[in-house]
Each structure stands twice: as C-alpha cells, then as structure tokens.
C-alpha cells in the first residue's frame, strides 16, 4: 500500500512540475529539440467530429493515452490533465488531447460523458477514438510508445506537441 502512495505522490509532483514547465516554456518551444513530427492520422472525437494531425497546427498540445474504465493510473493522469485544462481554459493557443486505448469500450458516447463529468465544456480538450489497430499504430509508430497488451499495458507519459505538429518532450 505504501508503494502505491509513493507512486501517486511521485505522479502528482511530476505533473505539478510539468504544469509549471508548460506555463513557463510553452510559448518558447524553440528551446526544446524536435523529436519527430506527428504522422498523419484521423480519429473521431467525443462529439463525432474528425480530429487529425492537422489539428495540432497553431496550438501547443498536451496529449496522453487513457481509457475510461482504468482503475490504475488513468484517473490520476486525467485529474492532472484536468488541472492543466483549468489553468489554460480559454487559451486558444493551448489544447489537450486524450486518446483512448480501449475503443471497444470507450464509445463516442462514453467519451462525451467522461468529458462532461470532468467539466470539459469546450473544444479545448478532445477525447479521441479509432479502431484499436489504428490506435496501436499511432501510439507505437507515431509517438514511439509501448503499444502491446492494450488497454492495460499503456504508457503513462504525457506528450508535448508544438504548434506545428512536432513532438517536443515526453513527461
């Protein structure tokens, strides 16, 4: 039990540091080296609208992979993202994206309900879904993250994407 508390504490501190860094550095992303460009993709958001890699243009993006029935790190990841969302709410140059790794369970309706339950009331935070093979491909080949054994084996990293669609940092 103590190990679990330490993991949660570490995650909270990490996300706090990450939030501070985003606030101070998001607009000056030229200091952070480009890791790679986000490849082309087209998924569907919680409102049934298409969302593609082109939606990363002109906005700094924080992206993560979650699933709504997760009882492990996802609720904490979502809570931390919610805090960032609250800090940047209404800032047109910043957006948040959560991609489900369990699209069979996380239907469009379920993602919409999740967004409403955590207080998302605009298009600044997108919850995306596609078929599992496409999610795995994007996760593994596009974001260079572990994509086997989904949904339970998903990465807990958040990804910083600059306003031209380049991956800049993993947290």
Language model features with spans:
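Short active-site neighborhood of thiol/selenol oxidoreductases, capturing the structured segment around
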Residues: 51-81, 97
């Amino acid at each position: 039990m103590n190990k679990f508390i330490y993991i949660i504490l570490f995650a909270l501190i990490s996300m706090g540091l990450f939030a501070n860094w985003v606030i101070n550095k998001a607009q000056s992303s030229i200091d952070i080296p480009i890791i790679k460009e986000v490849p082309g993709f087209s998924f569907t958001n919680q409102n049934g609208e298409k969302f593609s890699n082109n939606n990363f243009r002109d906005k700094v993006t924080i992206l993560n992979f979650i699933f709504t029935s997760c009882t492990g790190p996802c609720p904490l990841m979502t809570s931390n993202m919610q805090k960032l969302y609250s800090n940047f709410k209404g800032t047109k140059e910043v957006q948040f994206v959560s991609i489900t790794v369990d699209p069979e369970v996380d239907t469009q309706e379920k993602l919409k309900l999740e967004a409403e339950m955590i207080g998302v009331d605009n298009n600044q935070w997108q919850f995306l879904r596609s078929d599992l093979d496409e999610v795995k491909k994007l996760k593994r080949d596009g974001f260079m993250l572990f994509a086997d054994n989904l949904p339970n084996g998903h990465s807990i990293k958040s990804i910083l994407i600059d306003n031209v669609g380049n991956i800049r940092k993993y947290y």
